[in-house]
From Swiss-Prot:
A zinc finger (C2H2-type) spans 172-194, 200-222, 228-250, 256-278, 284-306, 312-334, 340-362, 368-390, 396-418, 424-446, 452-474, 480-502, 508-530. This is Zinc finger protein 30. The keyword Lipid biosynthesis does not apply. One of its GO terms (cellular component) is nucleus. Its main location: nucleus. Pfam families: KRAB, zf-C2H2. It comes from the Eukaryota. It comes from Mus musculus (Mouse). It is found in: Nucleus. GO terms for biological process: regulation of DNA-templated transcription. Keywords: DNA-binding, Isopeptide bond, Metal-binding, Methylation, Nucleus, Repeat, Transcription, Transcription regulation, Ubl conjugation, Zinc, Zinc-finger. The gene is Zfp30. May be involved in transcriptional regulation. GO terms for molecular function: DNA binding; zinc ion binding. Belongs to the krueppel C2H2-type zinc-finger protein family.
Length: 533
């Protein structure tokens, strides 16, 4: 029976920058996952002696794979060819060369297995590695056939593995929830949500992940030299694409628009999550109680709340946290550890990010601009809250009275009116508060601390919000207009109180005589009548 040898040459073929930019964030993550997972399969087949391709190294570092695209395909050197010929591996006749990208070869190995991978059952599979020079390593996939047949092979480009199926076809369906996918690998990753499988574990901290790319991204936290820092606000990211998405928050760029409501987003993934509000899609179901969620993060949080064993509990006070980082930060409250000092005023902080934000008080830096009115902010979150003044958005609803709020903290504070609970006591004077932040603000009265100084008149304040309110006295700014009568106010709280004149709302009710008031201070003054009686 005739013998022939088929040689596969692994060359550095990948996406161009233009092709890479056309992929969505999800498709890029999928590409990373397939590449890294298939490489691990190849190593398990061939042994750890296999040298790592450049594209795998780049993906592990969070860099873009198009950075190593080569326009020209490399050729076998005569020296290598003679070496292989001397071993009887490369006969002059019946030798066929097929050029594949690294990840297509790996992908076919994973899908079909090593014995019949790529060409079928008639071929024996062997892997040879040879180094042409000190800069580049090739993988030789040499397969001998005993049938004398020329292999049947239809070449596909790398992009074809990730192209959408015709007419939006999604042939791969999840047996648990019915969700369908265009690519089989997407289904494999999705099924791990239902099974809870997290096969990729970090050797540094033991944290486990469903996808190999997520582990690689996480490991950069331990390797500080592979982190990406924003030059504007010093925020740290483990992936360059995350940094680029974040940088849009400084310039206000939001290129992804929702066709239903017109809301715009910085990142395509945020738009995809938002669209589920309109479609009502909740693809992530809890196997314990059947409750469904729009985001997998919400499901994970829900499952941790139901499973006491998965919580991280403080041994000092018993408070539980959903993640270990939250517990570590909380533990510093008990130890008093504040390792990050401000060089200007000496104030210390538990978290480095708190120091970065605090330093902007001294520098006056406000990197976040409102495109509507030009107002600037030191924090991106403050800009988001401010923009809701222009849009009128109030996403947080009280289930008791159907009142809406711009901030979640405002909702929580408001709900305390209904339940009357004040769990946070001041050890100095015994005064109780509904919110821990209110207690913290109150305690600065006893300490006499006033870290926020007005640059105009040198007056100091306990709270940043007090300084912001005060500064409007110097500028004369009154940004809050009443839509009923046109009256303008310096403070948003003043506008809210004023609007109750038009609406007739009196939310503060006396528990003794049921009399209602527009302002809380009016209720407090009234309650003294009953105490004097």
């Amino acid at each position: 029976m005739a013998h022939s040898t088929v040689m596969f040459r692994d060359v550095a073929v990948g996406f161009s920058q233009e092709e890479w930019e056309c992929l969505s964030a999800y498709e890029r993550d999928l590409y990373r996952d397939v590449m890294l997972e298939n490489y691990s399969h190849l190593v398990s087949l061939a042994g750890c002696s296999i040298s790592k391709p450049d594209v795998i190294t780049l993906l592990e570092q969070g860099k873009e794979p198009w950075m190593i695209v080569r326009a020209e395909k490399r050729r076998w050197s005569r020296d290598l060819e003679s070496r292989y010929s001397s071993n009887g591996l490369l006969p002059e006749k019946n030798t066929y060369e097929i050029n594949l990208s690294p990840w297509e070869i790996m992908g076919r190995i994973q899908r079909r297995g090593p014995e019949d991978s790529l060409l079928g059952k008639d071929f024996e599979y062997k892997i040879y590695e040879e180094q042409e020079n000190s800069h580049r390593v090739y993988f030789r996939h040499v397969i001998k056939t005993t049938s004398g047949k020329r292999p049947r092979y239809r070449k596909r480009t790398p992009v074809s593995l990730y192209q959408k199926t015709p007419n939006g076809e999604k042939p791969y369906e999840c047996g648990e929830c019915g969700k369908a996918f265009k690519v089989r690998q997407q289904l494999t990753f999705h099924q791990r949500i239902h099974t809870g499988e997290k096969p990729y574990e970090c050797k540094e901290c033991g944290k486990a992940f469903r996808q190999c790319a997520h582990l690689s991204r996480h490991q950069r936290i331990h390797a500080s030299d592979k982190l990406y820092e924003c030059k504007k606000c010093a925020k740290i990211f483990t992936c360059s694409s995350d940094l680029r998405g974040h940088q849009r928050s400084h310039v206000g760029e939001k290129p992804y628009d929702c066709k239903e409501c017109g809301k715009a987003f910085r990142v395509r993934g945020q738009l995809m999550l938002h669209q589920r509000i309109h479609t009502g899609e909740k693809p992530y179901a809890c196997t314990e109680c059947g409750k469904s969620f729009r985001q997998v993060a919400h499901l994970t949080r829900h499952q941790r709340l139901n499973s006491g064993s998965s919580r991280h509990e403080c041994k000092e006070c018993g408070r539980a946290f959903l993640c270990s980082t939250g517990l570590r930060l909380h533990h510093k409250l008990h130890t008093g550890e504040k390792p990050y000092d401000c060089k200007e005023c000496g104030k210390a902080f538990r978290v480095r990010q708190q120091l970065t934000l605090h330093e902007r008080i001294h520098t006056g830096e406000k990197p976040f601009d409102c495109k509507e009115c030009g107002k600037t902010f030191s924090r991106g979150y403050h800009l988001t809250l401010h923009q809701r003044i222009h849009t009128g958005e109030k996403p947080y609803e009280c289930k008791e009275c159907r009142k809406f709020f711009r901030r979640y903290s405002e909702l929580i504070s408001h709900q305390g009116i209904h339940i009357g609970e004040k769990p946070y006591d001041c050890k100095e004077c015994g005064k109780a508060f509904r919110l821990f932040s209110q207690l913290t603000q109150h305690q600065s009265i006893h300490f006499g601390e006033k870290p926020y100084k007005c640059m105009e008149c040198e007056k100091t304040f306990r709270l940043l919000s007090q300084l912001t309110q005060h500064q409007s006295i110097h500028t004369g700014e009154k940004p809050y207009d009443c839509k009923e009568c046109g009256k303008a106010f310096r403070l948003h709280s003043s506008l809210i109180q004023h609007q109750r004149i038009h609406s007739g709302e009196k939310p503060y009710k006396c528990t003794e005589c049921k009399k209602a008031f527009r302002q809380h201070s009016h209720l407090t003054y009234h309650q003294r009548i009953h105490k004097n009686l």
